[in-house]
Amino acid sequence: MTRQAAGVTLADIQRPVADRLDTVAEELARMIAADLPLMQDVNRHLLRMKGKLFRPTLLLLTHEASGTGDPRAVRLAAIVEAIHLATLIHDDSVDHSVLRRGMPTVNTLFSHQVSVIMGDYLYSRAIIELARLDDLEPVRVMSRVTNAMTVGEMRQLAAFDALDFDERQYELLCRSKTASLFAAACEVGALRAEPAQRLAAQRYGDALGMAFQITDDLLDYTEAEAVTGKPSGHDLKEHKVTLPLIAVLSRLPAPERREVEALFHSAAPDGEQVARVVRLVEQNGGLEYARDRAAAFALEAEAALDDLPSSSARDALRDAIVYAVERRR
């Protein structure tokens, strides 16, 4: 890759589109505004939780890199962020998560019923804004991705024996739940570009999303909690099997395999159980394997950029690859 990870920040990546990202936040607030006081309260909370706007950033950068001058780019970026927020709200409700971005989740602060309805509301607002564009192409792309994410979530819920989850199923899940929205954001950013550039943007987003998700799953094994100094192991506590564990399961000796099974059979695994499984995964090469897979997808993303013309926006997209695989959270 062209730059060292230590030299790439999100601010660097967003610099070519920073002014329009502020407008995206304003457009999102306008888009989800509601008259009902309860919905207004939830919206205020959601806007305070505003994340990194990474997906809108990718959309605006691919729009810049493709050089199409599409005046709808900011609105499309806000639509993508609304859909992303909807998925987070629904995911937190399904997982009974307490915190998101260091703040209480909607289901914690309000209720599970409110979180389900608000997720639906954000989806419906996105659909309304798409319809107002009077163009079927972004509707086709975004309806396809929302369907993929929904099926992916159901596929995860339907995995009755988590320890039978293999790498093919894992990649299918990552592609549907994460990479699909990355790919859609990048494709929509290049909607008015030449077909080859639109395809390149979509391929870039897909590969970047895969690298991003694998890195996210790695962080669950490597990120230290401030108090204990041990890996957080949040996914393991929730009995979620991700690539680092998948990579070693088939070759673990029977006694160590039984330790993993004991954790997954425990309704509430304790910190020592989690720490022990994390050590087993690391000692047997699971973290290294996952890093290698993330790096492979990063190379795919970088190769896709070769079909976009040289520009500062394309450079920022290249930096986004480094950021995705080297970030701490």
Enumerate the predicted regions with their spans:
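All-alpha prenyltransferase/terpene-synthase fold signal
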Residues: 1-329
